[in-house]
Amino acid sequence: ELQYPFSDLPEPGRCVVVSPGVKWLRMPLPMALDHINLYLLEDDDGWWIVDTGMGLDSTQKLWEEIFAHELEGKPIKAVLCTHMHPDHCGQAGWLCERFRIPLYMSQGEYFSARVYSKMTADDFSWTTERYYREAGMPADYFEKMKANFSGFGSVVETLPGAYHRLEDSEYLTIGGTRWRVFIGSGHSPEHVCLYSAAKNVLISGDQV
Protein backbone atom coordinates (compact mmCIF):
# COMPACT_ATOMS: atom_id res chain seq x y z
CA GLU A 1 0.00 0.00 0.00
CA LEU A 2 1.34 3.40 -0.99
CA GLN A 3 1.75 5.98 1.74
CA TYR A 4 1.91 9.69 0.97
CA PRO A 5 3.85 11.55 3.68
CA PHE A 6 3.03 15.01 2.32
CA SER A 7 -0.60 16.05 2.10
CA ASP A 8 0.19 19.55 0.80
CA LEU A 9 1.29 19.74 -2.84
CA PRO A 10 3.67 22.50 -3.99
CA GLU A 11 1.83 25.48 -5.42
CA PRO A 12 2.96 26.66 -8.88
CA GLY A 13 6.22 28.57 -8.49
CA ARG A 14 6.70 27.40 -4.89
CA CYS A 15 8.40 24.51 -3.08
CA VAL A 16 7.70 22.13 -0.21
CA VAL A 17 10.60 21.06 2.03
CA VAL A 18 10.69 17.25 2.15
CA SER A 19 13.94 16.98 4.13
CA PRO A 20 16.46 19.57 5.34
CA GLY A 21 18.17 20.87 2.22
CA VAL A 22 15.74 19.14 -0.16
CA LYS A 23 12.91 21.12 -1.77
CA TRP A 24 10.19 19.60 -3.94
CA LEU A 25 8.50 21.53 -6.72
CA ARG A 26 6.23 20.68 -9.63
CA MET A 27 5.97 21.92 -13.19
CA PRO A 28 2.88 21.47 -15.37
CA LEU A 29 2.87 19.23 -18.47
CA PRO A 30 0.52 19.67 -21.45
CA MET A 31 -0.67 16.05 -21.47
CA ALA A 32 -2.69 13.50 -19.50
CA LEU A 33 0.19 13.18 -17.02
CA ASP A 34 -0.17 16.82 -16.09
CA HIS A 35 2.89 17.52 -13.94
CA ILE A 36 6.48 16.54 -13.22
CA ASN A 37 8.25 16.47 -9.85
CA LEU A 38 11.52 18.41 -9.63
CA TYR A 39 13.90 19.13 -6.78
CA LEU A 40 16.28 21.70 -5.37
CA LEU A 41 19.24 20.40 -3.34
CA GLU A 42 20.92 22.92 -1.06
CA ASP A 43 24.71 23.09 -1.19
CA ASP A 44 26.94 25.23 1.01
CA ASP A 45 27.21 27.93 -1.64
CA GLY A 46 24.12 27.48 -3.79
CA TRP A 47 21.44 25.16 -5.14
CA TRP A 48 21.45 22.17 -7.45
CA ILE A 49 18.43 21.78 -9.72
CA VAL A 50 17.38 18.16 -10.31
CA ASP A 51 15.34 17.95 -13.53
CA THR A 52 13.95 20.98 -15.29
CA GLY A 53 10.52 20.67 -16.90
CA MET A 54 9.70 21.06 -20.60
CA GLY A 55 11.17 23.74 -22.82
CA LEU A 56 8.07 25.95 -22.71
CA ASP A 57 7.70 29.66 -21.95
CA SER A 58 5.23 28.82 -19.18
CA THR A 59 7.85 26.64 -17.48
CA GLN A 60 10.43 29.42 -17.60
CA LYS A 61 7.96 31.81 -15.98
CA LEU A 62 7.44 29.38 -13.09
CA TRP A 63 11.19 28.99 -12.70
CA GLU A 64 11.41 32.77 -12.36
CA GLU A 65 8.94 32.51 -9.48
CA ILE A 66 11.13 29.86 -7.85
CA PHE A 67 14.22 32.05 -8.25
CA ALA A 68 12.42 35.00 -6.69
CA HIS A 69 10.99 33.19 -3.66
CA GLU A 70 12.74 29.90 -2.90
CA LEU A 71 16.53 30.34 -3.08
CA GLU A 72 17.05 31.98 0.32
CA GLY A 73 19.70 34.32 -1.04
CA LYS A 74 21.81 31.60 -2.63
CA PRO A 75 22.54 31.22 -6.36
CA ILE A 76 21.85 28.29 -8.66
CA LYS A 77 25.13 26.39 -9.08
CA ALA A 78 24.38 23.24 -11.12
CA VAL A 79 21.73 21.39 -13.11
CA LEU A 80 21.38 17.61 -12.92
CA CYS A 81 19.06 15.77 -15.30
CA THR A 82 18.04 12.23 -14.43
CA HIS A 83 17.38 11.39 -18.07
CA MET A 84 16.84 12.63 -21.61
CA HIS A 85 13.07 12.99 -21.88
CA PRO A 86 11.89 16.56 -22.56
CA ASP A 87 10.03 16.99 -19.27
CA HIS A 88 13.28 16.27 -17.42
CA CYS A 89 15.88 18.06 -19.57
CA GLY A 90 13.82 20.51 -21.63
CA GLN A 91 15.02 23.62 -19.76
CA ALA A 92 18.58 22.43 -19.02
CA GLY A 93 20.09 24.53 -21.80
CA TRP A 94 18.25 27.67 -20.74
CA LEU A 95 19.18 27.23 -17.08
CA CYS A 96 22.84 26.48 -17.77
CA GLU A 97 23.14 29.41 -20.16
CA ARG A 98 21.35 31.84 -17.89
CA PHE A 99 23.44 31.08 -14.80
CA ARG A 100 26.65 29.90 -16.54
CA ILE A 101 26.54 26.65 -14.60
CA PRO A 102 27.46 23.03 -15.39
CA LEU A 103 25.14 20.23 -16.49
CA TYR A 104 25.38 16.77 -14.91
CA MET A 105 24.03 13.70 -16.75
CA SER A 106 25.03 10.14 -17.53
CA GLN A 107 26.76 9.66 -20.86
CA GLY A 108 23.95 7.71 -22.50
CA GLU A 109 21.33 10.23 -21.44
CA TYR A 110 23.32 13.29 -22.53
CA PHE A 111 24.09 12.05 -26.02
CA SER A 112 20.59 10.64 -26.48
CA ALA A 113 19.21 14.04 -25.51
CA ARG A 114 21.53 15.75 -28.00
CA VAL A 115 20.26 13.52 -30.81
CA TYR A 116 16.59 13.54 -29.91
CA SER A 117 16.51 17.30 -29.33
CA LYS A 118 17.25 17.73 -33.05
CA MET A 119 14.19 15.71 -34.04
CA THR A 120 11.34 17.34 -35.92
CA ALA A 121 8.06 16.06 -37.32
CA ASP A 122 9.96 14.91 -40.42
CA ASP A 123 11.85 12.37 -38.30
CA PHE A 124 8.76 10.23 -37.75
CA SER A 125 10.17 7.49 -39.99
CA TRP A 126 9.03 4.12 -41.32
CA THR A 127 11.13 2.43 -38.61
CA THR A 128 9.08 4.24 -35.97
CA GLU A 129 5.88 3.14 -37.65
CA ARG A 130 7.04 -0.46 -37.89
CA TYR A 131 8.00 -0.53 -34.21
CA TYR A 132 4.60 0.67 -33.01
CA ARG A 133 2.73 -1.60 -35.42
CA GLU A 134 4.66 -4.65 -34.20
CA ALA A 135 4.03 -3.58 -30.61
CA GLY A 136 0.30 -3.83 -31.30
CA MET A 137 -0.69 -0.18 -31.51
CA PRO A 138 -4.11 0.22 -33.22
CA ALA A 139 -3.90 1.86 -36.64
CA ASP A 140 -6.25 4.75 -35.78
CA TYR A 141 -4.30 5.56 -32.61
CA PHE A 142 -1.03 5.46 -34.53
CA GLU A 143 -2.31 7.89 -37.17
CA LYS A 144 -3.48 10.29 -34.47
CA MET A 145 -0.11 10.13 -32.73
CA LYS A 146 1.72 10.69 -36.01
CA ALA A 147 -0.41 13.73 -36.83
CA ASN A 148 0.37 15.30 -33.43
CA PHE A 149 4.09 14.47 -33.40
CA SER A 150 6.30 17.55 -33.47
CA GLY A 151 9.56 16.04 -32.25
CA PHE A 152 11.56 16.46 -29.06
CA GLY A 153 13.20 19.56 -30.48
CA SER A 154 10.06 21.64 -30.08
CA VAL A 155 10.13 21.28 -26.29
CA VAL A 156 13.88 21.04 -25.53
CA GLU A 157 16.07 24.13 -25.27
CA THR A 158 19.48 23.73 -26.95
CA LEU A 159 21.65 21.68 -24.62
CA PRO A 160 25.11 22.81 -23.48
CA GLY A 161 27.99 21.58 -25.62
CA ALA A 162 29.71 20.05 -22.59
CA TYR A 163 28.59 18.17 -19.49
CA HIS A 164 29.85 16.41 -16.36
CA ARG A 165 29.44 12.66 -16.75
CA LEU A 166 27.70 10.78 -13.92
CA GLU A 167 28.60 7.13 -13.42
CA ASP A 168 27.08 4.32 -11.40
CA SER A 169 28.10 4.11 -7.71
CA GLU A 170 29.89 7.45 -7.61
CA TYR A 171 28.99 9.97 -4.90
CA LEU A 172 28.10 13.63 -5.04
CA THR A 173 28.54 15.61 -1.84
CA ILE A 174 25.98 18.41 -1.73
CA GLY A 175 25.64 20.51 1.40
CA GLY A 176 27.50 17.90 3.43
CA THR A 177 25.15 15.13 2.27
CA ARG A 178 26.51 12.23 0.25
CA TRP A 179 24.24 11.24 -2.64
CA ARG A 180 25.00 7.94 -4.32
CA VAL A 181 24.44 7.75 -8.06
CA PHE A 182 22.54 4.71 -9.32
CA ILE A 183 22.23 4.07 -13.05
CA GLY A 184 19.09 2.28 -14.21
CA SER A 185 17.64 1.33 -17.58
CA GLY A 186 14.36 0.46 -19.24
CA HIS A 187 12.60 3.80 -19.05
CA SER A 188 15.60 5.43 -20.74
CA PRO A 189 19.18 4.39 -21.64
CA GLU A 190 21.17 5.28 -18.48
CA HIS A 191 18.69 6.82 -16.05
CA VAL A 192 20.27 8.49 -13.00
CA CYS A 193 18.81 8.12 -9.50
CA LEU A 194 20.21 9.77 -6.37
CA TYR A 195 20.08 8.18 -2.93
CA SER A 196 21.04 9.63 0.44
CA ALA A 197 21.31 6.99 3.16
CA ALA A 198 21.63 9.70 5.81
CA LYS A 199 18.36 11.32 4.78
CA ASN A 200 16.70 8.07 3.63
CA VAL A 201 15.69 9.95 0.48
CA LEU A 202 15.65 8.55 -3.06
CA ILE A 203 15.26 10.87 -6.03
CA SER A 204 14.17 8.37 -8.64
CA GLY A 205 13.10 10.51 -11.60
CA ASP A 206 11.00 8.14 -13.73
CA GLN A 207 12.87 4.96 -12.82
CA VAL A 208 10.65 2.18 -11.46
Predicted features by range, described:
Residues K23, P102, R178-R180:
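Conserved beta-strand segments of alpha/beta enzyme cores
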